[in-house]
Structure formats: structure tokens, C-alpha cells
Regions:
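Conserved helicase RecA-like core
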Residues: 1-209
Length: 209
């Protein structure tokens, strides 16, 4: 692909791209773009590797940091956190057992990869659960259909990657389940922050190998 005519480069969710192992690919792509381009980089966190990429590829950049909004009294998340240690070959059975006990009205199940999202969704559906997958490999039409089904209660479980879950408009989730351990504390906090919002109580479960 000839990138010599590129005028603007936008790097969105840069920290997630690095977590997924795309740092070298990102560098290689940026090296092929003109030095005169305009670059915008968006990242929820600013780890050293992101800062290094910014220094190399952004010319006289302006850094804009958005401060966290203060949490109002009574609005702090109230999330009960639980971890279950199981052998890898029993993870799907453990997930099913957690769901049977918790009986969530609406739950987000986080997986690390697209393939795992599809596999876990298929396994849950084969056991009689109403679950849908959402990840970056799906078209916008597919994603919209899945989100509509989740919001209206047609499906009770949404199995997602971290990247796909960012920016989703989901007003209330009763449970968050980490099928895989997140890559960092920030990702963990972002995941479980989907439940227990606006003073509600929520629950977060993590399945640990």
C-alpha cells in the first residue's frame, strides 16, 4: 500500500493496539507516511511505549489531557469482586457454573481475542444461554444488531474484546465476567467499571487459570 499521499493519520485506542502486540506494525506503518502529515493520537493511558511513539512520529505535538470527573456522593461504583481459580480445560464449565449461580440479567463477558470471543459464545449458546459476540471483525450492521438485542433483553450475555467494548452505550450491566485476566490494572478497572454505575450495586467475577 502506497502511503506517500497520506495527509492525516489518526491513532485511536493506541494503548490497546500496543497491548495486542501491534507496536512494531504501528511503527512500520508510520515510517511509510510523509513527514509532513498531521498526526492525532488518542489513548486512555500514556505508558512509556506510547510516549516513545509520540516523540518519534509527532512533530511539535500539543498534549491534551482530560481530567477525571469528580465522583458525586453516592455515585461511586459498588462492585463486589470475586476470583475463581480453575484449570484451563475447565474454564468454560467454570464460566457456566458462575452464570448458573449469579443468574445475571445482563452481563458482559470479556475475552482476550476475537477467536476466543467466538469460541466462548458458541460454547455458551450450545449450553442454552442467550449470548452474542461482539468484536472488531464484525461489520457495523452486525454490531448494531447485537447491541440492539442486548439493550432490549433479547440476549442476556454479551461476549466481547476490550477494543470492541470501548465506547459502547450500555446504561446498566448487572455483572462483568473476566474470562481472561486483563493485560493491566487500567484495563481491569475499565472492565469492571461497566457495572455498579450511578450508585447501583454490581458484581465482577474473574476466572483465573
Amino acid at each position: 500500500v502506497d502511503l506517500s499521499a497520506v495527509d492525516v493519520v489518526v491513532l485511536d485506542e493506541a494503548d490497546e493496539m500496543l497491548d495486542m502486540g501491534f507496536a512494531d506494525d504501528l511503527d512500520a506503518i508510520l515510517e511509510e507516511t510523509p513527514a509532513t502529515k498531521q498526526t492525532a493520537l488518542f489513548s486512555a493511558t500514556m505508558p512509556p511505549r506510547i510516549a516513545s511513539i509520540a516523540r518519534r512520529h509527532l512533530k511539535n505535538p500539543v498534549e491534551v489531557t482530560i481530567a477525571r470527573e469528580p465522583v458525586k456522593a453516592g455515585a461511586a461504583p459498588r462492585v463486589q469482586q470475586t476470583a475463581y481459580v480453575v484449570a484451563r480445560q475447565h474454564k468454560v464449565s467454570a464460566l457456566a457454573r458462575v452464570l448458573d449461580i449469579a443468574m445475571p440479567k445482563s452481563a458482559l463477558v470479556f475475552c482476550r481475542t476475537r477467536l476466543e470471543v467466538d469460541e466462548v459464545t458458541a460454547a455458551l449458546n450450545s449450553r442454552g444461554y442467550r449470548s452474542e459476540a461482539i468484536h472488531g471483525g464484525m461489520s457495523q450492521v452486525q454490531r448494531d444488531r447485537v447491541m440492539q438485542a442486548f439493550r432490549t433483553g433479547q440476549t442476556e450475555l454479551l461476549v466481547a474484546t476490550d477494543v470492541a467494548a470501548r465506547g459502547l452505550d450500555i446504561p446498566s450491566v448487572s455483572h462483568v465476567i473476566n474470562y481472561d485476566l486483563p493485560s493491566s490494572l487500567e484495563v481491569y478497572v475499565h472492565r469492571i467499571g461497566r457495572t455498579g454505575r450511578a450508585g447501583r450495586e454490581g458484581a465482577a467475577m474473574t476466572i483465573v487459570e
